[in-house]
Amino acid sequence: MVSYRALEVDPGGPDYSDDEVDRIFRALADATRRDILRRTLAGESTVSELADRYDMSFAAVRKHVNVLEEAGLITDHRIGRERRIRGDLRAIRGAQRLLDAFEDIWRARVDRLDALLAED
């Protein structure tokens, strides 16, 4: 198995373990979680405010929020008794750098294949 450290993501960027990458992609694999992430990047919300926007229980929305938190894609803070959730733009950029590294690998492979085909 190839380590994500070997992808040479951005030297100044995050250093992902296999488990961290799994959590990020698992979180982003669900449409509801992507929508929650979009909403919390646009502005802070409570879980109750988020739950009002979906045709599912508060507990189900809470589980989606937990998955996003475990992936590091959203953070929370308290204002009095209220727990406010917001998307973490730095984490999103880190995930983008990881995807960019994968793209670079595949582009290099295609370029090598093109070069081999051009030799014939």
Regions found by a protein language model. Give the residues of each.
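N-terminal helix-turn-helix DNA-binding core of bacterial DNA-binding proteins
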Residues: D19-A59, I79-R97
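Short beta-strand "wing" residues that participate in macromolecule-binding interfaces
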Residues: D76
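Amphipathic alpha-helical dimerization/coiled-coil segments
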Residues: M1-E20, R38, R93-D120
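Short, hydrophobic-biased segments on the C-terminal half of alpha helices
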Residues: V65-N66
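Glycine-centered, phosphate/nucleic-acid-interacting loop/turn motifs that mediate DNA/RNA or nucleotide
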Residues: G72
